[in-house]
Each structure stands twice: as structure tokens, then as C-alpha cells.
């Protein structure tokens, strides 16, 4: 889908990165596991219609250092002074009131620690309830299907922006975080 930002620019989604997710449609749900406990949950239930946007970081295989580095780049862009989260803070608005971030990875829960992820990804929230895993380490009969269902590459991942009404607004590469940032900034701040 092509999105027109308020400032006149256009930002094109990359639907091929998540072939099971349709821009403009509701975010589908898949079974995943909570990273901290391994308890299975419906991913769609983590995206409530509560007035907040949700940034879903399909982080891919975080057991690989090069993939963790790609995810850290996302946080570096979100920490820039001109980033939407920083601009919200300048207006005395808590970013958590407007956004939530969810991370879904395919790495091993034994090899990946939540503390490996930059805290800035979580916009000041507690990351313990925001990191989920899709692999077959917990219950093989219910897991390791979310990335397939979403049509996302299990190694590389992608970014998805979900509107407050649970409809998908944007799909891009992790390296496209600057485009996501521009889209959000032009729409909100």
C-alpha cells in the first residue's frame, strides 16, 4: 500500500515481507509464546483497540549477532532527538500513552535474553510483557507457525505498524525504520 504523509511525501509498504498480513486489513492472530515464561498466547490479543498504535518488530532470529544488530539499529533511530517518541516527550506526552512495541522473534529462549534488546525499543515500558517467541521449544504442536502464518522470513523479520483499530498501516524492512518514523511523525506530532 502507498501512504501519503501529511507533509506531502509518500511511503510505500513492502507487502512481500509479510505475505500473510494485508495493509488496510485487521492484524491476524497467531499463537506465540511469552519469552519470559514460554506460556502460549494469541498474538492478536496483545494488540487491543485501546487508542494506541502498535509497532510490531518481527525481529527474526535474535540468536544471530547480525540480526540482533539490525534490531538495535531500530532502537537507535527511535532514540534520535527528532524521533516521534522524543518529540512526544517534549510535549509532555508519555509515548506509552500513544504507542506500544511488541517484539516477536524466532531465536532460542535459552540463547536470547530480554536484556540483549535495547530498552529504548519499549518506549519506557517494562519489556517483560512485550517480547514473544515463535519456535518449537515450548509446545511443538501449537508454536513455530506464527512467522509462517504471517508470511514473514524467520531469519530477517520485518516491521509492522498497526493502527489503534487493529488495522495494519505499514509493512517494511527493519532498515525501513526511518520511513516508519517519518510516517508516524507526520501523522501525529
Feature roles, as predicted:
Residues 1-189:
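Helical substrate-recognition/capping region of FAD-dependent monooxygenase/halogenase enzymes
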Amino acid at each position: 500500500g502507498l501512504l501519503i504523509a501529511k507533509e506531502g511525501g509518500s511511503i510505500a509498504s513492502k507487502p512481500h515481507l509479510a505475505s500473510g498480513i494485508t495493509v488496510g486489513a485487521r492484524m491476524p492472530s497467531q499463537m506465540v509464546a511469552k519469552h519470559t515464561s514460554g506460556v502460549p498466547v494469541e498474538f492478536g490479543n496483545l494488540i487491543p483497540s485501546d487508542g494506541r498504535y502498535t509497532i510490531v518488530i518481527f525481529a527474526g532470529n535474535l540468536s544471530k549477532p547480525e540480526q540482533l544488530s539490525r534490531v538495535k539499529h531500530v532502537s537507535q533511530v527511535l532514540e534520535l532527538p527528532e524521533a516521534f517518541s522524543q518529540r512526544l516527550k517534549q510535549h509532555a506526552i508519555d509515548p506509552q500513552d500513544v504507542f506500544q512495541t511488541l517484539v516477536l522473534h524466532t531465536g532460542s529462549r535459552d540463547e536470547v535474553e530480554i536484556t540483549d534488546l535495547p530498552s529504548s525499543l519499549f518506549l519506557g515500558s517494562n519489556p517483560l510483557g512485550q517480547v514473544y517467541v515463535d519456535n518449537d521449544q515450548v509446545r511443538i504442536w501449537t508454536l513455530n507457525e506464527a512467522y509462517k502464518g504471517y508470511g514473514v522470513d524467520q531469519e530477517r523479520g520485518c516491521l509492522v505498524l498497526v493502527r489503534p483499530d487493529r488495522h495494519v498501516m505499514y509493512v517494511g524492512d527493519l532498515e525501513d525504520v526511518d520511513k516508519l518514523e517519518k510516517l508516524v511523525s507526520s501523522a501525529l506530532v
